[in-house]
Each structure stands twice: as C-alpha cells, then as structure tokens.
Amino acid sequence: MSVNRSSTADFDGDGRTDISVFRPSDGTWYVMQSGSNTFRAQPFGQNGDKIVPGDYDGDGRTDFAVFRQTPQNGIWYVMRSSDNSFSTVQWGLNTDKPTPGDFDGDGKTDIAVYRGGTWYVLQSSNGQSTTHQFGAPDDIPVAAANVQ
C-alpha cells in the first residue's frame, strides 16, 4: 500500500503556502495553488522517491524535486519552475537523509544530505561542497528549504 506524502511550499510564487501531496503510486504531485485557487497535477517522480521540494533556481517559486536512492548513491531530480527544465545531481549515498535548505544564503535551495552526525552540503552559490559535523549518528536532521 502506497501512502501519499504531503508538503507545504509556495509553488505559484504568490508568497502564500500551497497545499500539496505527492502520490507515489503514480509519481504525481497534486497542488492546490493559493494564488489562483486552482488545482495542478504534475507528474514528477516515482514510487520510493523522497520528496525534497525547494527553490533550487531562486525564482521565488518552489521547484518539484525528489531524492532517489540507487543501489549505491542518492540522485537528486529537480524540475525548475523558472523554465521547466530538468536536472539531475548525484549527491550522497543511498543511506543518506536528504536535507535541502539555503545554507549559503543566496536565496536558492542547496542540495544537502545528513549522514551519521555529518551534514554534506553542495552550495548553489559556487558549486563547492562543505561538511559540518553536527548531531549524533541516530539524530533526525531538521532542515527546510528557504522558499521566498
């Protein structure tokens, strides 16, 4: 049995949170857009993906994004709201916990994972990676994308 996963984010860029769910059974995001009070269905992802929405392109609208675990790695799939282009980034291991957020303060969501007390961040501002030891191996990481 598949369980829908919910997310709150500003997909339409009106400054208000939109209600959304990701339905793994059909790989579709369902969004109630607050600006126009309209419904949007966006196929993007598949069963087993972890949802990681954020403003990866810095346009003020949340982008559809998922973290997919392969046998060895973690792959990030992002659909940019600015131009509907699609990108993939291999970042992390298949056992990592995805923790996107604006860690470098540039207004764009950075790709990041948490692994046993260490944060691994791929900065959107310069493409550089940073690591931060913070937390214990069994801690649950808390990070939120900076959606403007």
Identify what each model region corresponds to.
Residues 1-148:
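Trp/Gly-enriched beta-strand/coil motifs that build multi-repeat beta-propeller-like domains
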